[in-house]
């Protein structure tokens, strides 16, 4: 057996060498060349800051300022908005660096500038006014009756006027009164020395309507739908939308009115929620109704020269104490809201100890910051919120209870009214808001608040105080835009495939498809979470579906721009819409130009002849493991190099096509008869004749060499020719020997055509013999190869048989050894088992005989 194994080992050494060589060669054979392929409309994006445009359902017949502004500045909303979920996609959001907030701030400033459009310069009121108190007015809205002189149409003539002013709108002068009236002092309007005061007109209803912000073509808006998302960080539940939800541009301080509620728990947003002195934006998960009223008043129109000025009527105001404005709310529900806010904050900071959470009034500042400031139908309210923020909660962990309850179910906020207001837009005074006739009522929903902590959070501190704050309107817009971000959809990407573009192509069969690559952004992104291979199969269908929606969007933009041009009101929003449209067109043209330079115009998948460099990352495994977004991040540093190589290859392709088109001139037979071509034809003929002569010489040399190697001497080129003897010549015998009529070989000249025929015939025969020999040689090689493969197969079969025999032999040996071991073990066990059994039997017999032995002993003793 040992001899057999050694023989087998010796025989298989060569086979092991062959197997090792095949194992090394096989991976090399499997590495196929990859080529760069351009894919259009892939789900790849990057953060961007384009110009957004707005959409709204404005009522064209309404005179309300928001409607007028929206009808002129915004396009109609989409009746069937698209929202595509992005599965398996995560992205980072940061509301504190979101440019959408900045743009909305600019837009709302534009809205207010138009809604409170100044039309009358009020510089004539910046004069000394003699004012007296009015009995019956409340402390919150103290009023004075003032007399002042104004210039009439005739400049050198003065006229005395009377008007009512709120004390908060007046500034006392040190001048003494020229009259002897009691309680009379000299006043002027506030801030007359710092700015020009203008009157807002006309004063009508001021009810904000929802405005949707939309991304232009080629861009998309990501929306985070996670209920626990607070505006900063990574979101894992993302959808793609064309426009945001409807946002009501309600301007207020301290409280957020008519906003969007939090879907889950109360949301608290801040740059650092632990730091004191920083704004904390609170979004509630339930609303609290607040109703604000201003009683009936009369107004009077005063003609000052060619201008009209409106003020409160003097006749119906004196003695009327019901002029106080106020806001009502449910104090019990408000206390619950503050309690939930405190508990939510403690939950976010992971509080575990006991602490007192206090809500206190504003610490001071401008009237717009220390009071709840908002606009109600054109009147500017300044409401004292000290009662709303007068709560203390005793908390243990994240559970709080009310320590002081000083209010009933109904809460009332006293409010001031001002005619000369400080504009929140640019932080200056100078807007005179004329009083509105009649009774004013505004019903709002409290959906949030803006707070500040007195001190930085410290778990060892037992007291935390929150105060309301306001003034930065961007915080209000952040509550609406915290879960949005704008991205630019990259029109194309590049990836390696095994398919290469033909090196030369006349492009006669290129498909003419007008694909707007710069406009593919919604449905394409819906496949963002899929792998590259899965996403590439659905691009064509989504592209066709989405292109129609983008075309409609562009048409709506164009209609809005045309309407503004007809109304001669191409304002900043009209310019913004025009920029959005031009941006889309410029993006489209730029993308189409790049695709044209690469030879990919009109193609969704464009194969190129650029070989994928092994130094570039990526192989065929990326199609099943990576998404397009992940792949784009990996090649971001080398994509420009790849595109340059594609452009160079396309330039070479164009040059090759030019040469190919030049050869296409052979298709016209008339070009053959051109006199300028004749010299070229003669040149070709000379080349052909020279080639034939050269081949003839080579054949002669080869034949001579062959004959010399076979032992023959070279003969002159002769042809047989039968020579007829002249008549009358007697025949002779014997002298020359042989037959007299035998033909003789003598040289004979030939013509050009017979010689050409002979040469061609000889060349063809020689080529035929050469190819025949080559075919026979190939046949022999194939037969040898087949024989070798057959022998190799036989050897492999023999090796398998030997392996099977060896395996069978060893199995049999193992079986025999196991059987022998079991037999030996059985014999050994049997030997010592028999002794044990015999011993046990003896012991048992002895025990069994004990009674008998006892009986026998007793019998003997009795005998």
Swiss-Prot record:
| GO cellular component: a single term | virion membrane
Give me the ranges of the annotated region V4. Answer: 383-415
Q: Which residue ranges does the record annotate as region Immunosuppression?
A: 576-594
Q: Where are the transmembrane segments?
A: 685-705
Superkingdom in the source lineage: Viruses
* Posttranslational mods: Highly glycosylated by host. The high number of glycan on the protein is reffered to as 'glycan shield' because it contributes to hide protein sequence from adaptive immune system. Palmitoylation of the transmembrane protein and of Env polyprotein (prior to its proteolytic cleavage) is essential for their association with host cell membrane lipid rafts. Palmitoylation is therefore required for envelope trafficking to classical lipid rafts, but not for viral replication.
Identify the stretch(es) annotated as V5. Answer: 458-469, 460-469
Glycosylation, residue list: 59, 88, 149, 174, 180, 193, 225, 230, 237, 258, 285, 289, 320, 330, 350, 356, 360, 390, 396, 404, 410, 439, 445, 458, 463, 613, 619, 637
**Motif Di-leucine internalization motif located where?**
862-863
Q: Which residues form a coiled coil?
A: 633-667
**Disulphide bond pairs:** 54-74, 119-201, 126-192, 131-146, 214-243, 224-235, 292-327, 376-442, 383-415, 600-606
The region called V1 is annotated at 131-145
Which keywords does this Swiss-Prot/TrEMBL entry list?
AIDS, Apoptosis, Clathrin-mediated endocytosis of virus by host, Cleavage on pair of basic residues, Coiled coil, Disulfide bond, Fusion of virus membrane with host endosomal membrane, Fusion of virus membrane with host membrane, Glycoprotein, Host cell membrane, Host endosome, Host membrane, Host-virus interaction, Lipoprotein, Membrane, Palmitate, Signal, Transmembrane, Transmembrane helix, Viral attachment to host cell, Viral envelope protein, Viral immunoevasion, Viral penetration into host cytoplasm, Virion, Virus endocytosis by host, Virus entry into host cell
The GO molecular function terms of this record are:
structural molecule activity
Which InterPro entries is this protein grouped with? Gp120_core_sf, Gp160, GP41-like, HIV1_Gp120
The segments labelled V3 in the record are 292-326
Region named Fusion peptide: 514-534
Residue ranges, Extracellular side = 33-684
Q: What is noted besides the main data?
A: Inhibitors targeting HIV-1 viral envelope proteins are used as antiretroviral drugs. Attachment of virions to the cell surface via non-specific interactions and CD4 binding can be blocked by inhibitors that include cyanovirin-N, cyclotriazadisulfonamide analogs, PRO 2000, TNX 355 and PRO 542. In addition, BMS 806 can block CD4-induced conformational changes. Env interactions with the coreceptor molecules can be targeted by CCR5 antagonists including SCH-D, maraviroc (UK 427857) and aplaviroc (GW 873140), and the CXCR4 antagonist AMD 070.
Protein known as: Envelope glycoprotein gp160
Q: Which organism is it from?
A: Human immunodeficiency virus type 1 group O (isolate ANT70) (HIV-1)
What lineage does the source organism belong to? Viruses, Riboviria, Pararnavirae, Artverviricota, Revtraviricetes
